[in-house]
């Protein structure tokens, strides 16, 4: 089979939902086993490589940091889709997907893409997975220094040889609508470092934020979370002075900047927008904009076991 035309994206190109990678992050999923038709998430992962198969290791991380995982094999050009209600019902959180070999070691396989179709009573939206390239060796090469005799391996988001692309340090939500006409905005933040053998997250993350009106005036706020923060923005969340509805009144928009207070831990996330009014037409979702990258590597400890 002929290769795709054009020039391949370099492994050093930063994490994006518009490229393929060796590690994917789905920033949000949820489901309700008692009402799966109305509240559920369908995730899809595609192996875009034309000749090589790959093992994909899924880590489902709940908002309170508990981890459940499983693996499957994707042949060349294969797409795998699953309803979350069938495998991890009644949980919300994020999903980490890692390309591995049959021994359970992460490998360079910058050919994975993914999408999540998320629906509930208020909205039905598509959210692409964030892709992180492996920056080492040719395709199929295990992560440097990893041993099949080890029970764990460390994955570094370092943008250096032997690691994956860096995580964002500062992120932004753009075009936040006013609540006055029924528009609602949900902010999702994720911390993807930590130990995936027991409980993910790299400690409680203190986040500093700025909410701007459309005249460049800002109000600051603070929030904290461990693995995932998912809240609808209103006059109490986050707490600003003046309140959200004053900063973004009827007919106006604003935006938000967020970053970890220690300046080193990475953030990922997404924003969802919908309208609660009858026949409200506004709905959509996208991953947060990345403003800066971390100055130091964030690491994740992953279990090693064969497929």
Language-model regions: role of each:
Residues 2-307:
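Gly/Pro-rich, tryptophan- and cysteine-flecked surface segments typical
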């Amino acid at each position: 089979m002929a290769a795709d035309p054009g020039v391949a994206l370099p492994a050093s190109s930063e994490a994006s939902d518009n490229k393929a990678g060796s590690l994917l992050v789905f920033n949000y999923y949820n489901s309700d086993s008692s009402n799966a038709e109305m509240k559920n998430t369908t995730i899809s992962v595609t192996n875009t490589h034309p000749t090589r198969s790959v093992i994909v290791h899924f880590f489902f991380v709940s908002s309170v940091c508990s981890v459940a995982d499983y693996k499957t094999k994707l042949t060349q050009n294969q797409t795998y889709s699953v309803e979350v209600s069938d495998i991890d019902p009644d949980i919300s959180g994020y999903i980490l997907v890692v390309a591995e070999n049959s021994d359970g070691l992460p490998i360079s396989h910058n050919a994975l893409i993914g999408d999540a179709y998320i629906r509930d009573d208020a909205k039905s939206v598509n959210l692409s997975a964030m892709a992180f390239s492996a920056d080492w060796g040719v395709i199929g090469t295990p992560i440097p220094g990893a041993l099949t005799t080890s029970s764990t391996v460390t994955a570094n988001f370092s943008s250096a040889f032997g690691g994956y692309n860096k995580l964002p340090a500062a992120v932004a939500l753009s075009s936040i609508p006013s609540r006055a006409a029924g528009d609602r905005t949900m902010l999702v933040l994720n911390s993807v470092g930590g130990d995936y053998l027991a409980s993910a997250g790299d400690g409680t993350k203190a986040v500093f934020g700025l909410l701007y009106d459309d005249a460049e005036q800002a109000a600051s706020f603070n929030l904290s979370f461990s693995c995932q923060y998912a809240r609808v923005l209103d006059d109490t969340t986050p707490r600003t002075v003046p309140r959200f509805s004053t900063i973004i009144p009827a007919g106006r928009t604003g935006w938000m900047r967020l970053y970890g207070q220690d300046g080193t831990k990475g953030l990922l996330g997404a924003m969802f927008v919908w309208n609660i009014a009858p026949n409200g037409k506004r709905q959509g979702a996208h991953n947060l904009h990345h403003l800066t990258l971390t100055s130091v590597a964030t690491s994740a400890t992953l279990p090693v076991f064969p497929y």
